[in-house]
């Protein structure tokens, strides 16, 4: 699934597995939208799109407007067709990818798991993997966005 964040004309695309990662995606949306000192604004899908070609067309249009992609990673993330498509399109667009591991109880990742996941990420324009819980994502997601922007 997807969501976008705009920063003074600079947008960020959020790629995630809807069933597994939607809660954290909503948390990021709420954190960003409620922070009055932040320049970020979350843009959300306005209409539910169900057919594959329409989803891909929407993804293509949205990613063309962005410079950054937040990739929320849970156990099943890389098994999802649209997540892979969004990563590919983000790379083709030259986006910086900010991977965030959703390290909750349902997603107990070992260091070996994380190393394997790292190998699935692009080698260029990809920031280090952050952990949503261990790295206090709720408190730090805005800083991670600023860091990626170079602020």
Give each language-model segment a name:
Residues 1-65, 141-151:
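Conserved N-terminal substructure of TIR/SEFIR domains
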Residues 17, 74, 102:
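Cofactor-binding loop segments of dinucleotide-utilizing enzymes, especially the Rossmann-like FAD-
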Residues 21-24, 79-81, 105-110:
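Short catalytic/ligand-binding loop motif for oxyanion handling, primarily in non-cytosolic enzymes
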Residues 68-71:
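Inter-motif core of Ras-like GTPase G domains
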Residues 76-95, 107:
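Conserved TIR/SEFIR loop-to-helix hotspot centered on a Trp-containing motif
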Residues 97-101:
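Conserved beta-strand/loop subsegment of P-loop NTPase cores
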Residues 105-122:
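Glycine-rich, charge-decorated loop segments at or immediately adjacent to ligand/cofactor-binding or catalytic sites
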Residues 123-151:
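C-terminal helix of von Willebrand factor
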């Amino acid at each position: 699934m997807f969501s976008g964040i705009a920063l003074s004309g600079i947008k960020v695309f959020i790629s995630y597995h809807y069933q597994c990662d939607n809660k954290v995606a909503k948390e990021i949306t709420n954190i960003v939208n409620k922070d009055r000192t932040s320049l970020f604004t979350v843009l959300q899908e306005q209409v539910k799109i169900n057919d594959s070609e329409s989803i891909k067309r929407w993804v293509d249009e949205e990613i063309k407007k962005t410079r950054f992609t937040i990739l929320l990673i849970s156990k099943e993330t890389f098994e999802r067709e649209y997540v892979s498509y969004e990563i590919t399109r983000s790379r083709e667009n030259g986006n910086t990818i900010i991977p965030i591991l959703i390290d909750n109880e349902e997603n107990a990742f070992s260091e070996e798991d994380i190393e394997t996941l790292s190998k699935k990420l692009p080698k260029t324009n990809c920031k280090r993997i952050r952990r949503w819980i261990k790295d206090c994502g709720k408190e730090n997601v805005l800083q991670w966005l600023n860091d990626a922007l170079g602020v």
